[in-house]
């Protein structure tokens, strides 16, 4: 079984280790010095793959917008890491009033609009590749647009995009297929998915396995396993009382059903937990979010066996609270977060 610091080769992309910096919304923006230094610090700290936080897909329809991210991309690459960006499509969570079905203030998206969204993601993937990214991650988790299509709790359509799981996953399948055609091979496509909703009548692991298999057929490279339906959900954002390696068992069930690499996430702080997940074959990659906010050098401190020097996240959730309030995040354990220096 792989070790935490073993290289992972995915097609033409080599990841120097199995550590992923998960996409964490900062409210810093992206095209500025603050974000460049923030992400470069996590790359310098030893993460193998850096995923920039969730960003509206529409921004990446403009090649000039992507080109202005070149300094950030180069800063991460100079530290030896690979870089991707998480793309998402808006819904009522960010004030855009469309959804799979009529709900609250939202109108049901039409078939024509669905195809427009698919084309947007395909174009964005191409522009990201041309702009220097190693890959993109599609945000299909945590109650956002694609998650709403997949979940029976929010998809009440009675056409080819709603009903049984094959229909509810159709949009995701079409989207990944179009992105692969447009971006070509050798460019990483990741999909972040909530494997269970955690509510009666919601998404099941068996359905998530069907999705992972279908996306693999369409050319997906990495399946990123999370859970839950929202920002205030302890499944989506595990708490201090949550199990270490919160979603590892979910990831393991999906990994057993596919051939592509799988990411496990959720309260991984100790080397022993990360090693166990990998050695038990539950995942190929380990994603950390808040722990790498508290200590971006977590990977580098583990490599020489200096785990006692790691600054641990306390899961006080101040960072998430600030994010939800629309303010720049900060960390009670790391006063330098957002104030990184060259």
List the predicted regions and their residue ranges.
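Flavin-dependent oxidoreductase catalytic cores
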Residues: 1-342
């Amino acid at each position: 079984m792989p070790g935490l610091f073993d290289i992972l080769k995915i097609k033409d992309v080599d990841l120097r280790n199995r550590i992923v910096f998960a996409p964490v919304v900062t409210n810093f923006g992206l095209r500025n010095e603050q974000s460049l230094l923030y992400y470069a610090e996590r790359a310098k700290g030893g993460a193998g793959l850096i995923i920039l936080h969730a960003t509206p897909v529409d921004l990446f329809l403009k090649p000039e917008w992507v080109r202005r991210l070149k300094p950030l991309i180069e800063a991460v690459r100079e530290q030896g890491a690979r870089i991707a960006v998480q793309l998402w499509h808006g819904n009522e969570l960010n004030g855009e009033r469309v959804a799979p079905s009529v709900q609250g203030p939202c109108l049901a998206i039409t078939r024509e609009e669905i195809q427009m969204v698919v084309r947007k993601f395909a174009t964005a993937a191409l522009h990201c590749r041309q702009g220097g990214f190693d890959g993109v991650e599609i945000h299909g988790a945590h109650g956002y647009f694609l998650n709403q299509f997949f979940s029976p709790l929010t998809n009440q359509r009675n056409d080819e995009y709603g009903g049984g799981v094959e229909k509810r996953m159709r949009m995701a399948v079409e989207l990944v297929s179009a992105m692969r055609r447009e971006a070509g091979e050798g460019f990483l496509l990741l999909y972040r998915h909530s494997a269970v909703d955690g509510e009666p009548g919601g998404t099941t692991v068996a359905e998530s396995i069907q999705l992972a298999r279908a996306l693999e057929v369409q050319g997906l490279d990495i399946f990123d396993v999370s859970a839950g339906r929202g920002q205030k959900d302890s499944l989506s954002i595990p708490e201090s009382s949550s199990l270490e390696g919160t979603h590892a068992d979910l990831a393991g069930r999906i990994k057993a059903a596919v051939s592509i690499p799988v990411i496990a996430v959720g309260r991984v702080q100790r080397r022993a937990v990360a090693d166990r997940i990998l050695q038990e074959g539950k995942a190929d990659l380990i994603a950390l979010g808040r722990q790498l906010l508290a200590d971006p050098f977590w990977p580098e401190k583990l490599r020489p066996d200096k785990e006692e020097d790691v600054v641990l996240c306390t899961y006080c959730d101040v960072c998430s609270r600030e994010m939800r309030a629309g303010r720049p995040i900060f960390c009670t354990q790391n006063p330098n977060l957002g104030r990184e220096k060259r």
